[in-house]
């Protein structure tokens, strides 16, 4: 159940595996029998036709892939922390063989040995062959704790117990050392300050048991009275100064932390540090961001870990289970919401954008109690761009996927500021520097395939018949996604758009999709360069062709242009309607009013110019608060000023883009069921005269 390198399946994955053995002297067929990991669901996974000769063994992968041809794969995985496994007879009820297995150790198999069928572990797994001694040299049981991890306001006495007679409990409270001091437990441990207790069982002649830990976060005076209408995140780094390790040019390792994530109460609508957490547990954390790592208010990468320091998929704030997260810090974005607005509109439009929640963060790095001094402000807790069924849902590329058709996907790649760890390549025709996101370490064959595929795309795009509907560029890209991405960048005038922060994915046998959106904090006027603060003007005209991938040629196709503007006006009647956009901002503002006051008490930046805040443009009248001079960051002295300025900018931007193309004809009535004959008038809403064409051929 913790196969890391023992056995690979046909996909080159080290999936969980189990072995079935016919110990009888006769041939049998297990077709119609069942395997299950749940005693409440005995008929969980039905075995296909499976003949076994006398004393024959067969391997089945517990990978959740549900395959009944070729190598067999169950529709469940095995729990590495211990669980139930059973073989059920064809009646779907009768148990033929079963046992409860304990917590597993990486690449140590667990099973039976000899005629006695004794259960235990094997240092040298033998899939497909008989189990061989020695067996049972590992302690698999875990120490029991009298208390779960929690916040404390006073002293707590922690009792440790062993489920195995004759074993010794050893524990440590050393979190950061690579060579911690282990003590023998003989009396309750008095917890008076923030402490993590890690314990294991030991016994002569056996390897130490698996680690288990509990963490207790001490709240300082007054913290029990904290209330917020946003979720709270409390992180303790065990005296490690995470902010002091920030660097724009390298990725520092994630440091051990403990995180507590508290959602708002469904009845009161508030969250408090003493509330039952939505999730609490071990993790790793570091400062993230190249430019933003230099800001006073840091943003962080956060990873959820198990007791061994390995990735652990969990659900936080109702998001699908994963281990990689981002705690984003709006800083120069004084609206606190630019990224969230873009991510949620993209998600609502059906793209795999990251999910987000506003929250408030407390980060304790000095080793004392968590106090008001540890308040870091309003943050956005969000997902990271990754391949999985709940984020970017594409096939996983394994190291053996080096031939057609498997080599054709799934890839995630980006045009962005590079890190030294990125695997990069350059397109030949337009010369774009791109980097792999998934797989992050592709095989040479995979790297060559994607590079060549994009070269073929560019050759076609710049060919004489590039606009052919089936053999032109449309054969390579999902046109709608490229149009929507262009609209997002231009509508919000994202100064990192096109040239940076541009992500693409390609699933197996599918076209390239321009998505997900990423990093829009320098949008909606929040940039004093490349004309970013002005709501008029196309952003792409500020860029060189190398910074504007593929669109120069795409817009030479009249059909692409027509499709683009049809999409624009379609969105203007829905999600990008001016009233809908203003309502979205107002809803977020109402939720953020009180937290924003606390944020700007912590970070006294209102009325100050932070790079790259807009300095010149001001909203025209009539707008809420338009009697105030909102030009220049120094004149925007309140949170309301920042919101009004952004709303004014967005309104002007929507209006300006509308003027760049004739508006579509207006119908005198909506579609629907009619009785009898109905008249329909079609009129031209534009000031310029023109001919209206229509069709009734749907």
Feature locations, PLM:
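Acidic glycine-/aspartate-rich tracts in secreted/extracellular proteins
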Residues: 1-3, 23-27, 39-41, 63-67, ...
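A structural motif detector for short, solvent-exposed N-terminal "entry" segments of globular domains
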Residues: 1-39, 77-81, 99-104, 134-144, ...
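Solvent-exposed beta-edge/loop recognition patches
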Residues: 2-16, 41-120, 248-254
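Beta-strand signatures of extracellular beta-sandwich domains
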Residues: 19, 34-36, 84-86, 168-172, ...
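Short, compositionally stereotyped local motifs that mark structural "simplifiers"
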Residues: 51-54, 60, 104-249, 263-264, ...
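Middle-to-C-terminal accessory/interaction subdomains
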Residues: 98, 118-122, 128-139, 229-232, ...
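Conserved NTP-binding catalytic cores of kinases and kinase-like/nucleotidyltransferase enzymes
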Residues: 149-151, 161-163, 215-344
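Internal "kinase-insert"/substrate-recognition segments embedded within catalytic cores
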Residues: 299-331, 350-354, 369-487, 495, ...
